[in-house]
Amino acid sequence: MSQKTLFTKSALAVAVAIISTQAWSAGFQLNEFSSSGLGRAYSGEGAIADDAGNVSRNPALITMFDRPTFSAGAVYIDPDVNISGTSPSRRTLDADNIAPTAWVPNVHFVAPINDQFGWGASITSNYGLATEFNDTYAGGSVGGTTDLETMNLNLSGAYRLNEAWSFGLGFDAVYARAKIERFAGDLGQLVAAQNPALAPVAGQIPSDTKIAHLNGNQWGFGWNAGILYELDKNNRYALTYRSEVKIDFKGNYSSDLPIAINRFNLPIPTATGGATQSGYLTLNLPEMWEVSGYNRVAPQWAIHYSLAYTSWSQFQELKAKSTAGDTLFEKHEGFKDAYRIALGTTYYYDDNWTFRTGIAFDDSPVPAQNRSISIPDQDRFWLSAGTTYAFNKDASVDVGVSYMHGQSVKINEGPYQFESEGKAWLFGTNFNYAF
């Protein structure tokens, strides 16, 4: 595998792996910004204002709060993603639990200024992915370790025009940190089998040889906006937008292969003998539109729904360059725009207890021909339930749980053919307090 190809796949895994855990929405997007939302499959988030977390989705909801309100919690993600297959070398490609468990924390604060103005702030994560394979995995040249975390800092404000219309605007600062490692696996054996003249060199590369290590971190900036229309106190609708965020990763590349191996022109990344090279990669995180609604159809019952549209077609290629300006790779990705649809219901049992449930469908933006075991993306179906217990008018606790089921997919990557299947359980809790 050439350095150009290796960097293409490594950078893809790094750039789209923006998460503190495995991504559990389509593509590499995260929804886990609140536990109440988790319990309703994040349906109606732009129009519901039951806790401060909703403001991170729609800043116009700030006008629905009459007291400073705080919410903090986390969602625990327990994925079960398995890969199967057989390499041309006859070595197994089976790997279980390639996505690690992790916590996705969230913190939110909302404060009214007067009857017309208010502000809010939040700390969340909106994109990401993480996968881990054994160092001696046969498909190590496309597997290995992929881990990238993001933190989204949002500051927003809102203005109420009248009893019906409210508008909000926010600023996003996104910090991303990435790490990718790739190993030789059986790539040396495959090269030796195809070209016996190279067998003395390629055939001697141990499976756990680190053929690529890439890490980097950077800030990116964007904005979000929202409109809230209140037909009356029981019916409201929202339109929200979150902009594209450009991340210019700056980092290091190295390979443990001895430099002398470069003269054989093997299909593996250029060896550095453990030395480090500097490089950079630009990734455009896609923009998202969402339409939401909330209807209190009875004194104790409400329904809520959302349709989100993410412009994944903005993610068409990946290009990595050295600091000298040389193109290390250029690869067409061809993602397609995708949607997410969610529907839920809430039951207001009494002043203390609230129960909710929801279902959702995540459309995968990754075309079948572009799937990777570092991004084993697939269409996903959500089933969710949750509850809120209010201790009094000031303090409450949210609990939510979701089960996510992904369809089985086939992946063709390099000389390998895989099958992937995945599911996940998500558990969340938040504490809310109004001052």
Curated annotation (Swiss-Prot):
Coiled coil: none annotated. GO terms for cellular component: cell outer membrane. The lineage of its organism: Bacteria, Pseudomonadati, Pseudomonadota, Gammaproteobacteria, Enterobacterales. Its main location: membrane. Pfam families: Toluene_X (PF03349). It is a multi-pass membrane protein. The keyword Signal applies. One of its GO terms (molecular function) is long-chain fatty acid transporting porin activity. Residues 1-25 form the signal peptide. This is Long-chain fatty acid transport protein. It comes from Salmonella typhimurium (strain LT2 / SGSC1412 / ATCC 700720). Involved in translocation of long-chain fatty acids across the outer membrane. FadL may form a specific channel. It is found in: Cell outer membrane. InterPro entries: OMPP1/FadL/TodX (IPR005017). Belongs to the OmpP1/FadL family. It comes from the Bacteria. Keywords: Cell outer membrane, Lipid transport, Membrane, Signal, Transmembrane, Transmembrane beta strand, Transport.
